[in-house]
Amino acid sequence: MPTHLVWFRRDLRLQDNLALAAACRDASARVLALYISTPAQWQAHDMAPRQAAFISAQLNALQAALAEKGIPLLFHEVADFNASIETVKNVCRQHDVSHLFYNYQYEFNERQRDAAVEKTLPSVICEGFDDSVILAPGAVMTGNHEMYKVFTPFKNAWLKRLKEDIPPCVPAPKIRVSGALSTPLTPVSLNYPQQAFDAALFPVEEYAVIAQLRQFCAQGADGYESQRDFPAVEGTSRLSASLATGGLSPRQCLHRLLAEQPQALDGGPGGVWLNELIWREFYRHLMTWYPALCKHQPFIRWTKRVAWQENPHYFQAWQKGETGYPIVDAAMRQLNATGWMHNRLRMITASFLVKDLLIDWRLGERYFMSQLIDGDLAANNGGWQWAASTGTDAAPYFRIFNPTTQGERFDRDGEFIRQWLPALRDIPGKAIHEPWRWAEKAGVVLDYPRPIVEHKQARIATLSAYEAARKGA
């Protein structure tokens, strides 16, 4: 009887799991599951404590769900990816594994690890799957067989390719012949700092995640275009955490969206949310083609020469939400308190750090990863390089958000700001966007800082720094 081992990583679900489905295809095979915790590696990659707590909860739910199918989950903890190579080898030897199944990860360290694992297992058949994307990297290329560097042509080619053959979702495995496991389960515990997360916003059980997806596609996807930019409105899906850890697949998102919004592929209702899924694909494909992105190198080479300011005081003020710009500060306090930030606010806060404070985007990228429950290297790096004008198809370097007008535009009445900045709750109407002006006129002393920089002057300094770097190319 063959023994099939499924190595779980960022794919913590039963439904539409390509590696798990392939491992269970042979009804006569004994199927085992494996998860390896690597705390030192996670620390090096700045994994957020809230994401660790989320993964821990998902693992325990996964363990119970697998047990109902008759599949035991083996849990091991080692320091890092290098140590995990030997662990996989030992598990395969101990359980006489004939086949190893896993879903690809596209980051540089992860790809090196997987290649090393396959090399150490010459007698084991290893099968990998492009599970975390809808279309595999390399499926969408230019006429010169190169990766697209601009999103819109990539999107058009991606849609054309998708319409030719939409990848199906695969069902969860059936109960193995041996039946459900009867032995008591030992709770999985991760040796990594953890912070509590809101399980109502970020559900753990698969059925709850799928219910969240169904509700959004039926009730929210149609209005996503008009509501997605306003942080005081519940206009986004909140599915990013489940996508980041693999509690949900992008194929599940696509199929549910098309079931509810069948015109989405042609730009109809739901099409803007589909765009977000395609952006996710774009950044993953880019990371596979350009591994330097995994090492936090800018895509546009001349931007390496930007003379960043080293100002710990400014950086700390940004981290804590004490910059004196309400929309920036409210956003950062939301991030610090919940592990999540609205996407429009991610753009605003990133732009402020880089183009108002002239601080290296990589410091912001790293801080976001250390806080985000939905931390994902490809998406986070892509977003920061877009905001910093260092990435492919990024905002031009001279596009600099005015944080005050961004607040006035996307939180006009200050509803979101008041939620996160209690010191400003009593400021009337739109005056909340420039509280220092209101305070001066009203003769009130606010428990809130004045702006740490003046935007117009900061903009001039940033343009000068970028132009000097570009001319040195």
What kind of region is each of these model predictions?
Residues 234-423:
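Active-site-proximal binding-pocket segments
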Residues 46, 315, 446-449:
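Short coil/turn segments at secondary-structure junctions
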Residues 1-166, 269, 464-469, 473:
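Trp/Phe/Arg-rich N-terminal binding region typifying the photolyase-homology
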Residues 21, 90, 329, 347, ...:
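A broad detector of short, well-ordered amphipathic alpha-helices
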Residues 7, 49-50, 104, 225-226, ...:
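Short, contiguous strand/loop micro-motifs
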Residues 145-300, 410-411, 415-473:
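Glycine/tryptophan-enriched, flexible segments
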